[in-house]
Amino acid sequence: MMHLNPLVLVGAVIGVITALLVAAYAAVKDKKTAMGFERNMEDGEIMRRLARYARPYLSKFLIVGVLMLFSIAYDIISPLIVGRIEELVAGEFELRALFLGVSVYAGVLVFSMGSTYLQAVILQRVGQRIISDLREDLFSHIESLAHEQLNEIPVGKLVTRVTNDTNAISMTFTNLLVQLTKNSFVILGILVAMLCLNYELTLMVLCFVPFIVLFTVIFRKFSRRANRKLKNATTDINTYLSENLSGIKVTQIFGREDEKMEDFRKKSQKLARANQEQIFVFSVFRPLVYMLYVSSILCLFYLGGMGHLNNVSFLGQTISSGTIVTFYMYISKFFTPIQNLAEQFNWLQSALASAEKVFSIMDIQPRMQDAPDAIELDEVKGEIEFRDVWFSYVPGEWVLQGVSFHVDARQTVAFVGSTGSGKSTILSLICRNYEFQKGQILIDGIDIRKIRISSLRRHFGQMLQDVFLFSGTIRSNIVLREEGIPDSEIMEVCRYVNADKFINKLDHGLDEEVRERGNNFSAGQRQLLSFARTIIHKPSVMILDEATANIDTETELLIQDSLEKMRTVGTMLIVAHRLSTIQHADNIIVLSHGKILEQGTHQQLLARHGRYYQLYTLQYHKAQLNAAE
């Protein structure tokens, strides 16, 4: 029995470590939240949806499959060749036979390396194309969501879905699926080869498999937990950065840098801890598998060496030195894919979790959808009518209550009222940015719900108080990628809205760089560019929401002049903060708490001494006081 002492020692060490791992596993068994990988979508459904993106590249995957067979064959054949070479060297041999064996091994190795390289290149290219298709579909779907739906999802979360999560999915196509398949066949092929070579030594190796399975189950549990923590921490910090970098000027104005830094530090440390936990899990699992690998090698050398020295035969199979060398290589190639399988399966689960998050965004049904019988509008005169329209952002809290009015084609109508009266909401409903609950909104006598949304918005030009300019040039922001508009037409429109006065002073004119959100231009300049952007697309109805707010007097005069010119273009709807800009409107509608109080021309409303008269008087006296100062 003394000769079995080393094996007993190895078994005792493995047993103690296994007991400790089982105890750790049991400690979190009942903590459902510890798993953190619960999903609402089945793996099969996710894989089917991902397969739709892979289907156009099926021929490429077939080529990869053929190349994979060559690398699998190398893993199975190469140990046999090396074992044969060892037996040649151990005995009397001819140099020619040795040269032949080495040449065969070198040829198989080179062929395998070539096939592995081609396989990697094809997978990387195809994988990136698939993920590019997925990203484009995701971005297109996000663009189709209604305003209220976009308001419910943090921008940072959407950025994470389009970038981080799609990157995680790319691993599925570039590596995971092929490697999982390859490793499974390698394990099966090596097992068959070992059984054919020597039953006894193969059974010895198989004694370690239950421990590998147990370690893998435990590893999967803890690695899932670590992966989910890492994903959540990444999403949190991306959302925080997206919001706070956009509002960093407010932070500086109110001197809250230290408080924001403390918040960021907490989220950054949370992300660091999540990374550390994931690293720790892998740093424990890999040495454990390596311990089993080393233990099996020790057993091989011990049992195989004894069998070889004592010339022991088992079921008619002798243990030669070549057999020991072959098994040594097989054990290495057996344990490596097993370790990889465990890790790759976990990464696959992580990728599937990312895919579910992506598909959860893509499964959001746009609340604003075209009716089955929706029509295209080739031309719009600009007649608008509200019939008893009710609307609420939150159920039961009505923002508009039974609003009715009529706007004739090419008429200018202004909406005034205190904050929260529903002015901007009316303009948003006309463009179908939101869906109203009751009533009707008609364009040229047609219910807007019977018109295709894209067709409806094509005839509207909307200018907001907070003008958004994209990174690029002045030209690209005016034409918005519409091809074929010459510079002469762009400059003509700029002159029409008085934007040429500052554009001509710029070093590069229309090619002047526009930084993020147009921060290198003043509010008035951004507003004039917004006017030009609207006019150049020749809308039938123009909508201006607080277009003259927060600008200086000189720029206001330019904008008023532009407004007077724009009145001749088509129907114009204006939400005005400064009543001086709407005195020439054909009709002024005064709102309060979602209801129309009065309407009429500027002179008619002043003569009634109602709410409009009060607002105008307050602004007039305020303007006089400012002038006196």
What name fits each language-model region?
Residues 77-79, 83, 111, 177-220, ...:
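A hydrophobic transmembrane-helix motif
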Residues 151-156, 229-277, 373-375:
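Loop segments that connect adjacent transmembrane helices in multi-pass transporters
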Residues 54, 119, 123-124, 141-187, ...:
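Juxtamembrane loop-to-helix connectors within ABC transporter transmembrane domains
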Residues 1-40, 61-115, 122, 196-200, ...:
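Transmembrane helix-loop-helix hairpins at lipid-water interfaces of multipass membrane proteins
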Residues 363, 370-371, 377-629:
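ABC-type nucleotide-binding domain
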Residues 2-11, 59-80, 84, 101, ...:
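Alpha-helical segments in transporter systems
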Residues 233, 256, 280, 289, ...:
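Cytosolic ends of transmembrane helices, especially the final helix of ABC transmembrane type-1 domains
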